[in-house]
């Protein structure tokens, strides 16, 4: 991400930065591109104030979708973008199925099975969702230590399905890293496995209960779909909130 230079004289490490929501200032870090940045992560909405205008890069993650009709919820959208001459303002960190934003840059909200990453299917009627095919690692950096092996925005899995008249279907697995969800397969009423990282698992298709989808557990990931056993259903799992990152390069 290229930005026009602001010129020398900005000491990024000692720059005064305040925020009235929940956030973490990791200080100066070296990321996988070998460059040094001041890294910030915002986990609730608030107002950001930076002592001097800076060039920075942001990563915006929307909330994941809830499971729906036994289908896994979609993972949220993720967007990386450079912002020049930025001194702060409103930061919106969305709950499940919401849109996050910073500096006039935002991502769309998701609901249902399709979005940033697809949710798994439930049966032959309620199929899987599709993803957008884009990396779900902040700043396209899949090896940085804070999130290595943890792509954001995983899809939730589909719940299992059992019907005395229409057979058994195992719920499809949730998608990972911008991929589509898996389709349901005949033969078993088991729930699918949530996508990596933190997508909710699908519920079991059982008429004896224990068939609710599980909630997502990582930023932007979708909830698992309920299991359906002869019309006995549990609840769909909930999607997980979004997050917003900002990194300020030491070289301005």
PLM features per residue range, with description:
Residues 3-12, 17-49, 55-252:
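Low-complexity, glycine/proline-biased repetitive segments and flexible coils/loops
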């Amino acid at each position: 991400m290229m930005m026009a230079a602001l010129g020398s004289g900005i000491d990024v490490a000692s720059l005064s930065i305040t925020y009235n929501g929940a956030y973490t200032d990791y200080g100066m870090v070296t990321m996988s591109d070998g460059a040094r940045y001041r890294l910030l992560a915002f986990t609730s909405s608030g107002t950001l104030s930076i002592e001097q205008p800076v060039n920075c890069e942001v990563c915006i993650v929307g909330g994941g979708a809830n499971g729906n009709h036994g289908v896994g919820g979609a993972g949220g959208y993720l967007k990386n973008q450079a912002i020049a001459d930025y001194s702060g303002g409103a930061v919106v960190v969305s709950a499940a199925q919401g849109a996050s934003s910073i500096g006039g840059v935002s991502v769309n909200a998701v609901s249902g099975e399709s979005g940033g990453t697809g949710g798994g299917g439930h049966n032959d009627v309620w199929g899987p969702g599709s993803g957008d095919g884009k990396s779900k690692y902040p700043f396209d950096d899949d090896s940085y230590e804070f999130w290595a092996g943890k792509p954001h925005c995983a899809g939730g899995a589909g719940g299992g399905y059992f019907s005395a008249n229409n057979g058994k279907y195992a719920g499809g697995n949730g998608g990972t890293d911008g991929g589509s969800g898996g389709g349901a397969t005949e033969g078993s009423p088991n729930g699918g496995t949530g996508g990596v990282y933190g997508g909710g698992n699908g519920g079991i298709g059982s008429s004896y209960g224990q068939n609710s989808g599980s909630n997502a557990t990582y930023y932007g990931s979708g909830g698992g779909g309920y299991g359906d056993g002869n019309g006995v259903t549990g609840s769909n799992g909930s999607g997980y909130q979004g997050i917003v990152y900002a990194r300020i390069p030491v070289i301005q």
